[in-house]
């Protein structure tokens, strides 16, 4: 069987410039929708993790209060040592705890949350690491 050259009509098969531009425009629209949604999802995830870390800390904080009758002198290292608290690495005690109140903070992926405890078994979450 002899080799025969393929005859063409002068046009190559492929996509035109207009077709490629339309596909790029569609991809751009999809990215404009997907990227903000993804960023919002990751931010909500980080907030949820920070809140969960703080909730896990509160039983140790209240156990400290039950043992000592005050929050004064409470430290993260002391909570870890005395109450076997599985405290997350980002958890910190802000300021100096008083006899009746404390502030525990957690920063997860740049999102700061705080728990301000005005007394035994009562607390409130605040965003932006604000305990005041």
For every predicted segment, state its role:
Residues 1-15:
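N-terminal leader/signal peptides at the extreme start of proteins
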Residues 11-38:
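N-terminal single-pass transmembrane signal-anchor helix
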Residues 24, 51, 58:
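Conserved catalytic core of two-component sensor histidine kinases
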Residues 32, 40-43, 59, 63-66:
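Regular, well-ordered alpha-helical segments
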Residues 37-54:
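Aliphatic-rich helix starts adjacent to a transmembrane/signal segment
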Residues 59-132:
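Periplasmic/extracellular, small/polar-rich flexible segments of pilin-like filament-forming proteins
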């Amino acid at each position: 069987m002899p080799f025969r050259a393929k005859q063409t009509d002068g046009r190559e098969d492929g996509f035109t410039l207009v077709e490629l531009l339309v596909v790029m425009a569609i991809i751009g629209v999809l990215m404009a929708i997907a990227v903000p949604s993804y960023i919002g999802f990751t931010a909500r995830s980080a907030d949820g993790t920070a809140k969960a870390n703080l909730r896990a800390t509160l039983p140790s904080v209240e156990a400290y209060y039950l043992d000592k009758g005050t929050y004064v002198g409470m430290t993260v290292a002391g909570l870890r040592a005395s109450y076997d608290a599985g405290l997350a690495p980002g958890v910190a005690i802000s300021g100096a705890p008083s006899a009746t109140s404390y502030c525990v903070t957690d920063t997860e992926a740049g999102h700061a949350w705080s728990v301000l405890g005005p007394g035994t078994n009562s607390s409130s979450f605040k965003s932006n690491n604000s305990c005041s």
